Each structure stands twice: as structure tokens, then as C-alpha cells.
Amino acid sequence: MDTKELRGRKEALLREAEAICKAAEDGGRDFTAEERQKVEGLLKDAKDLKAQIERAEGDEALKAQILTL
């Protein structure tokens, strides 16, 4: 999977987390236990994708350096 696809997946996860936050906020309430668990899982997955993106970008930078030397 390329970085564009990874970014798209990460953004989708964050949009889903934001929607859950907005629903709780609009309802004038805290998260339910299920919502909290879901948001925590979404954030973990988004952080994992961010790390994958950073590794992929680092690999691309290394490859570019090899080609320029």
C-alpha cells in the first residue's frame, strides 16, 4: 500500500472518531463506554498508520538519496 492510500485510511479513521466525538458533544454528554472504546481503537489504528506512513516516507527518501549519489 502506498503512502497516499495509507493517508486516506488514516483520514477515514480520524473522521469516524470525530463523528463519534461530535455526536456525544451535540448530545451534551460524555462518551458511552462503547464510544470511548471505539474512539480509543480508532486513534490507535490512526497512530499505527501514521508510523507506517513515516517509515514509507523514510524509505522513499533513502531510495532517492541512493539514486542521487
Question: Whereabouts are the PLM-identified features?
Answer:
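Intrinsically disordered, low-complexity terminal tails
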Residues: M1-L69
